[in-house]
């Protein structure tokens, strides 16, 4: 049986005019800023806040295979299922990054009949937010180098500049570069480097800001580097926070699109969850809560990464409690964690599913530690067998875990009704949500708490560099920030080959980064990179554009 590609399905779908989608959730035309017929930005100042805000349903996942487990697909499909049940619902997603689109992942707007549209636009340049973020980030780099070139009044030590340039592309050759070469007229030579745009602190700030004023305040607090006597230098010292916020004045507005089934969708912001905090913008989520009774959103990768950061960073900053958490599981991921090689994942292997269930179990238990009841969604794939699915259902029953087989890829919203009904039962009950740790704990204790309670590790080792940074950050008054772990998504440990539910391992913190604008401390583990590289055969090899301007190969 031949299945249509995601792009084919998207191209065959009929989109509603964006003003009709807006009207369906009460967005007035004067609050709508159309970008063509099917996309728009929303002027949040023209949205009336409501007292009884919508409930937030978070979608996370077990530790994924390299292909991903369909978390975005389930997120969109669950929202469509609520729509099918006549619930007032919106979906809130992150924007895809170009780098992974051309790399290993392809597009990131859901899949099958559970997609947000127009998928070509969203997966490519969309409404220009990432370009604005890239421009603001690199403008700051230009201001820093110009300040040094023009006499360096602030006494910035060019050996201790923390701020890097960014590009929305996977480009390993740019990780370490030299700038200012070619003589005195070209600036002061120094070492620099590039991160991918989604790792930029500007991206995190945009996603954690509540208003233009908040955006400007957070930008002003960015630490760009240090003086020769190790004093922090901020954007406020350079006096360019206003200019940077001006570049972002449109990017901060949430983007409105729609699912295949006409469910309104806010797609805004896109930090990675393995190297950043992995959640869409607070503004988009809060706007959706003012417009809908239920808001379905996602956080990147597994509960150890995106969901933990959603709870400890985003929800804490925004001041809301998630009403329910869906944990996406797939039979292929369970088999991978049960020891099956990538090439054999399509073959039935119930014993491997049994062996791999420990990974799902830990993710389920992680959610419970935040005081929220999890619901497992088995995201169906065509190679799953009845015996494999039945084992997972029986495991859930034995462990009193809510579970539903989800077929939204094939059936759209109708394939997610069972999941929606399970979630409805959870959100109607009170929960006892609380973050994992108190902000008053010392940084090293917050890190140890994440490693031991969420990852299952036994010990945290800090490199000599990280130990010095802990001391320096405490002296600078940064000890009360939440922690954003930078770690592989494939394992609970910092070794991506250690699958299943390992325990007793040590995690090494090799370096810390102070994101004083965004308001968190990044702890880098293992070999995690903030500028990815492309694989040997990138997805770009299968992409093209037709003579009439339509994309080919965006999955």
UniProtKB/Swiss-Prot annotation:
Q: Known EC number(s)?
A: 6.3.4.3
List the catalysed reactions.
(6S)-5,6,7,8-tetrahydrofolate + formate + ATP = (6R)-10-formyltetrahydrofolate + ADP + phosphate
What metabolic or biological pathway is this protein involved in?
Answer: One-carbon metabolism; tetrahydrofolate interconversion
Q: Which GO terms describe its molecular function?
A: ATP binding; formate-tetrahydrofolate ligase activity
Q: Domain of life, per the record?
A: Bacteria
| One example of a Gene Ontology biological process annotation | tetrahydrofolate interconversion
Q: Which Pfam families is this protein grouped with?
A: FTHFS
Keyword Ligase annotated = yes
Annotated keywords: ATP-binding, Ligase, Nucleotide-binding, One-carbon metabolism
UniProt-annotated binding residues for ATP: 65-72
List the InterPro entries. Answer: Formate_THF_ligase, Formate_THF_ligase_CS, P-loop_NTPase
- Family designation: Belongs to the formate--tetrahydrofolate ligase family.
UniProt protein name: Formate--tetrahydrofolate ligase
Q: Which organism is it from?
A: Staphylococcus aureus (strain NCTC 8325 / PS 47)
């Amino acid at each position: 049986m031949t299945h249509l590609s995601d792009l084919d399905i998207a191209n065959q779908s009929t989109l509603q005019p964006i003003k009709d989608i807006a009207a369906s959730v009460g967005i007035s035309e004067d609050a709508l800023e159309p970008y063509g017929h099917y996309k728009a930005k929303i002027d949040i100042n023209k949205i009336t806040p409501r007292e009884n805000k919508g409930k937030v349903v978070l979608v996370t996942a077990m530790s994924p295979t390299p292909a991903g487990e369909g978390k975005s697909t389930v997120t969109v499909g669950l929202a469509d299922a609520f729509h099918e049940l006549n619930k007032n619902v919106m979906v809130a997603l992150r924007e895809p990054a170009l780098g992974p689109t051309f790399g290993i992942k392809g597009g990131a707007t859901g899949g099958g009949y559970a997609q947000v549209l127009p998928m070509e636009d969203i997966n490519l340049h969309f409404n220009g937010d990432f370009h604005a973020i890239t421009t603001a980030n690199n403008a700051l780099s230009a201001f820093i180098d110009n300040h040094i070139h023009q006499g360096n009044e602030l006494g910035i030590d060019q050996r201790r500049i923390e701020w890097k340039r960014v590009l929305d592309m996977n480009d390993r050759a740019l990780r370490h570069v030299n700038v200012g070469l070619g003589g005195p007229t070209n600036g002061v030579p120094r070492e620099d480097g590039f991160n991918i745009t989604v790792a930029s602190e500007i991206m995190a700030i945009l996603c954690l800001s509540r208003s233009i004023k908040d955006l400007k305040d957070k930008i002003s607090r960015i630490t760009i580097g240090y003086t020769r006597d190790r004093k922090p230098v901020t954007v406020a010292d350079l006096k360019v926070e206003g200019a940077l916020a001006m570049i972002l004045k449109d990017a901060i507005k949430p983007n409105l699109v729609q699912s295949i089934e006409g469910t309104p969708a806010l797609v805004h912001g896109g930090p990675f969850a393995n190297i950043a905090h992995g959640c869409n913008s607070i503004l988009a989520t809060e706007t959706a809560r003012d417009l809908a009774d239920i808001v379905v959103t996602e956080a990147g990768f597994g509960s150890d990464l995106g969901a933990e950061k959603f709870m400890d960073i985003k929800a804490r900053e925004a001041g809301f409690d998630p009403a329910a958490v869906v944990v996406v599981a797939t039979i292929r991921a369970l088999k991978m964690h049960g020891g099956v090689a990538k090439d054999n994942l399509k073959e039935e292997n119930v014993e491997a599913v049994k062996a791999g269930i420990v990974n799902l179990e830990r993710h389920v238990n992680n959610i419970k530690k935040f005081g929220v009841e999890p619901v497992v969604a088995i995201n169906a794939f065509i190679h799953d067998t009845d015996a494999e699915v039945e084992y997972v259902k029986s495991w859930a029953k034995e462990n009193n875990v809510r579970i539903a087989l989800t077929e939204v890829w094939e059936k759209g919203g109708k394939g997610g009704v069972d999941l929606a009904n399970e979630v409805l039962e959870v959100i109607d009950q009170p929960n006892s949500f609380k973050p994992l740790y108190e902000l008053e704990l010392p940084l090293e204790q917050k890190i140890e708490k994440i490693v031991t309670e969420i990852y299952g590790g036994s010990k945290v080792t800090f490199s000599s560099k990280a130990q010095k940074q802990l001391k320096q950050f405490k002296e600078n008054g940064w000890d009360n920030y939440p922690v954003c772990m930078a770690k592989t998504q494939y394992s609970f440990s910092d070794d991506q080959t250690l699958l299943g539910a390992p325990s007793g391992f040590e995690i090494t913190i090799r370096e810390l980064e102070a994101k004083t604008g965004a308001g968190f401390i990044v702890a880098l583990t293992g070999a995690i990179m903030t500028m990815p590289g492309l694989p040997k055969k990138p997805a770009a090899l299968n992409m093209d554009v037709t003579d009439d301007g339509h994309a080919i190969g965006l999955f």
